[in-house]
Amino acid sequence: MATSLTPADPLQEAAIVLFSGGQDSATCLAWALSRFGRVETVGFDYGQRHAVELACRARLRDGMAALDPDWATRLGQDHTLALDALGTVSDTALTRDAAITMNENGLPSTFVPGRNLIFLTFAAALAARRGARHIVGGMCETDYSGYPDCRDDTIKAMQVALNLGMASRYVLHTPLMWIDKAETWRMAEGLGGADLVELINRESHSCYLGVRDVMHPWGHGCGTCPACMLRRAGWERYVADGADA
C-alpha cells in the first residue's frame, strides 16, 4: 500500500509481521527484514485445522536468520496469541472437521469471517506496546480464494480505522497484494536467492488439511485443497518461467 508516511530511512523503524508459517507470510517476513531495522513476528492460534503451520514458524525464522547476518540482527521477538474465541464462533471448514465446499454467497467454506480484521487489530495493539509503526501482512487479491478481508479496499479501511481508533500513525503494508503465487516465489528469490526459495518451499505450510507428511516439488500438503492447488499452480508457473528465461 503506497503511503507518504514511510520515512526516508525505514531502517530506523520497527515492524510487526503477521506470520502464520505459510508461504505468503514467510515471503513478507523476508520483505520486512530487507527494509526495517527491527522486525517482530506475531502468529495466531485460533483453533485452525492446519495448526501445524504454527510449528513451522520457528524453523522459518531460524532459517532466515542463518541466510543473512543483517536479517539475523534485525529479527526481533516472536509472539503467539491465543484467539480461541475466533474458532469458537466460526463455523467453517478451517475451524471444523468439515468438507471444503463453495457456499451460496460465492465464498469457500474455509472463509473465517473477520479473521484478518481481528488479526490486524491485535497486531496494532501489539505494535503499540512494542513501539512499531509498520504492520506487514500477506493479504492478496490476485491469486486468492475470494476472501473479502484480503482485499486492498479492506486493508485501506482498516488502516484508517486503526489510526482513528488508536490515535496512531500505523502504516499497513501488503507487498503481495497485486502479485500472483508465481510472482511471490519470484519475490522470494529476489530477496534471498535460491536458498530462501528452498527454505520457504521446505519449511512453510499452506495445506488447509494440515497434511505435513507428503512432500511435493512445491512443498508439503494434500495436493487437493484450494491452498495446495494455488501453491502448486504458482510453483509450476514459477519453474516454467525460470526454464524459459
From Swiss-Prot:
CDD domains for the chain: QueC-like (cd01995)
InterPro entries for the chain: QueC (IPR018317), Rossmann-like_a/b/a_fold (IPR014729)
Pathway: Purine metabolism; 7-cyano-7-deazaguanine biosynthesis
The UniProt record lists the keyword Ligase: yes
Enzyme class: ligase
EC annotation from Swiss-Prot or TrEMBL: 6.3.4.20
Residues the record lists as binding Zn(2+): 207, 222, 225, 228
Keyword match Acetylation: no
Binding note for cofactor: Binds 1 zinc ion per subunit.
Cofactor needs: Zn(2+)
Residue sites binding ATP per the record: 19-29
Keywords of the record: ATP-binding, Ligase, Metal-binding, Nucleotide-binding, Queuosine biosynthesis, Zinc
GO aspect biological process, one term: queuosine biosynthetic process
GO molecular function terms noted in the UniProt entry: ATP binding; ligase activity, forming carbon-nitrogen bonds; zinc ion binding
Catalytic reactions of this protein: 7-carboxy-7-deazaguanine + NH4(+) + ATP = 7-cyano-7-deazaguanine + ADP + phosphate + H2O + H(+)
Database matches in SUPFAM superfamilies: Adenine nucleotide alpha hydrolases-like
Function: Catalyzes the ATP-dependent conversion of 7-carboxy-7-deazaguanine (CDG) to 7-cyano-7-deazaguanine (preQ(0)).
Family: Belongs to the QueC family.
Name assigned to this protein: 7-cyano-7-deazaguanine synthase
Gene: queC
